UniProtKB/Swiss-Prot annotation:
Phosphoserine modified-residue sites: 69
Its job: Regulates ATP-dependent protein translocation into the mitochondrial matrix. Inhibits DNAJC19 stimulation of HSPA9/Mortalin ATPase activity.
Name by which UniProt lists this protein: Mitochondrial import inner membrane translocase subunit TIM16
Family label: Belongs to the TIM16/PAM16 family.
Family annotation (Gene3D superfamilies): DnaJ domain
Tissue: Expressed in trabecular bone and cartilage and by differentiated chondrocytes localized in the hypertrophic zone and by osteoblasts at early developmental stages.
Lineage of source species: Eukaryota, Metazoa, Chordata, Craniata, Vertebrata
Annotated coiled-coil segments of the chain: none
Gene Ontology terms describing biological process: DNA biosynthetic process; negative regulation of apoptotic signaling pathway; ossification; protein import into mitochondrial matrix
Pfam families: Pam16 (PF03656)
Membrane topology: Peripheral membrane protein
């Protein structure tokens, strides 16, 4: 009886161990595929987010832009910067957020232009 119980326990541990190993391999493969999909631009964009303290989405929300167009970014930046000027009753905190958002979007535009040059395409403007 004890012999059979020991065999059942050993078989159960083997099954669970194999399942765990298979799940671990699948998770590793999925994380590698996701990293490959992000590519090199993802690393640059993440580095830009770390430097400015804002993600790309946050910067777009602050400046109210949906597409990365240098003209639209500049227009919205100038408007929000003037509106939040402390001399007209604005907030220095909000004005600094606007500046950081503009810096972040300018960095993203620079990264895109660099990628376009590397691909031999005309930069988007």
């Amino acid at each position: 009886m004890a012999k059979y119980l020991a065999q059942i326990i050993v078989m159960g541990v083997q099954v669970v161990g194999r399942a765990f190993a298979r799940a671990l391999r699948q998770e590793f493969a999925a994380s590698q595929a996701a990293a490959d999909a992000r590519g090199r631009a993802g690393h640059q964009s993440a580095a830009a987010s770390n430097l400015s303290g804002l993600s790309l989405q946050e910067a777009q929300q602050i400046l109210n832009v949906s597409k990365l167009s240098p003209e639209e970014v500049q227009k919205n930046y100038e408007h929000l910067f003037k509106v939040n000027d402390k001399s007209v009753g604005g907030s220095f905190y909000l004005q600094s957020k606007v500046v950081r958002a503009k810096e972040r979007l300018d960095e993203e535009l620079r990264i895109q232009a660099q990628e376009d040059r590397e691909k031999g395409q005309k930069p988007k403007t």
